[in-house]
């Protein structure tokens, strides 16, 4: 607050560099939300009318909306019942069908749900076979790793997106970032972030020598900029990122142990990955408890436990139903949704509070 800049100052590139360096990417483009980051990522990859983008139905709506913002069509690939991420098998089947009708997507957006990394090596191999680009939606996954590398390295994707919303692993109040190791994509995202404007002489169009042109709008962009105040907060959060994730894993390990005796399924951990552990989702064994998901959810709420549902399949939202999507489109995602409840997961969750959560779950599961 005592600096000369509230926005468009030195803290933004410093934060971008800190995140990119941590993740092992060459460039970071900070924006005002992960939604904006997904949008500029689609724009940078040339997504537009006539194109298709595929993503997971088990995600927040922004993972799909970014395609629509760009004028493209969106479709969904069902999830793996163990990881809750996009199923590689279903993706391969859908791609083969699309190839037969010349409708392979331009971009696929795998979502690292709850911080658990997708099988990016397999998805990348399919991208090489079928010719699509990849945007990793890692909104839940900063601080996680896949095959020993930080999520965000972009080894298996063109662009990776992080979220810094207040409920995420680190926060800037509101904010997001798109990472890439491609300088052309980075420059395009910088332009789309700020009205499609550039101040770089080498990118400007020729003008009469007696006219002063400090900047030019060379494309249609948005005002998606992050402020210096937000970036300063982000820099302070980055210092504690590994600590936050370590604490989340300790909380998850305690949950794993405490929930063993209850009729629920706890989150699976991939041996190839290290989750950012944004969420801890239990699946109810409904055939054993003889209670509905709503019964359990409402009981926990009544007991003061801050539970949530992640996620209603995107295509079940009324807006998407008006586009023609119907119930049953992704059976695994719908079965998961009917059984899933997210229980409290945050670094300040004490052992005592965790015990209270378990007691409340035990009570809620009983008829």
Go through each PLM region and give its residues.
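PLP-dependent aminotransferase-like
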Residues: 43-129, 133-138, 145
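Structural detector of well-ordered beta-strand residues that form the stable sheet scaffold
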Residues: 29, 54, 75, 134-135, ...
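PLP-dependent aminotransferase class I/II
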Residues: 10-18, 25-26, 89, 93, ...
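Active-site PLP attachment segment
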Residues: 155-199, 228
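Conserved active-site segment immediately N-terminal to the catalytic lysine
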Residues: 136, 140-171, 187, 213-218
């Amino acid at each position: 607050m005592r600096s000369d800049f509230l926005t468009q100052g030195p803290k933004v590139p410093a934060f971008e560099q800190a995140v990119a360096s941590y993740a092992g990417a060459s460039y970071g483009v900070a924006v005002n939300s992960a939604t904006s980051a997904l949008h500029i990522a689609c724009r940078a990859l040339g997504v537009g009318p006539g194109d298709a983008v595929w993503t997971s139905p088990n995600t927040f709506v922004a993972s799909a909306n970014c395609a629509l913002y760009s004028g493209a069509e969106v479709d969904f690939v069902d999830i793996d019942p163990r990881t809750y991420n996009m199923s590689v098998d279903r993706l391969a089947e859908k791609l083969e069908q699309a190839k037969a009708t010349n409708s392979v997507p331009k971009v696929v957006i795998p979502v690292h749900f709850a911080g658990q990394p997708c099988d990016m090596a397999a998805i990348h191999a399919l991208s090489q076979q079928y010719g699509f680009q990849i945007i990793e939606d890692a909104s839940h996954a900063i601080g996680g790793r896949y095959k020993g590398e930080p999520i965000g390295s972009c080894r298996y994707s063109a662009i990776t997106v992080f979220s810094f919303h207040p409920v995420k692993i680190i926060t800037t109040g509101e904010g997001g970032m798109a990472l890439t190791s491609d300088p052309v994509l980075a420059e395009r995202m910088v332009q789309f972030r700020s009205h499609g404007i550039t101040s770089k002489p080498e990118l400007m169009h020729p003008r009469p020598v007696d006219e002063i042109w400090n900047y030019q709008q060379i494309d249609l962009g948005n005002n998606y900029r992050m402020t210096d105040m937000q970036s300063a907060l982000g820099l302070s959060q980055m210092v504690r990122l590994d600590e936050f994730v370590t604490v989340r894993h300790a909380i998850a390990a305690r949950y794993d142990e405490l929930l063993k005796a209850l009729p629920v399924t706890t989150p699976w951990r991939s041996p190839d990955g290290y989750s950012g552990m944004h969420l801890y989702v239990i699946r109810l064994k409904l055939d054993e408890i003889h209670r509905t998901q709503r019964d359990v959810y409402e009981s926990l709420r009544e007991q003061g436990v801050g539970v949530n549902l992640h996620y209603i399949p995107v295509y079940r939202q009324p807006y998407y139903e008006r586009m023609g999507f119907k119930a049953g489109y992704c059976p695994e995602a719908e079965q998961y949704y009917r059984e899933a409840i997210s229980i409290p997961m945050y670094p300040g969750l004490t052992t005592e509070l965790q015990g209270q959560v378990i007691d409340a779950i035990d009570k809620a599961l009983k008829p």
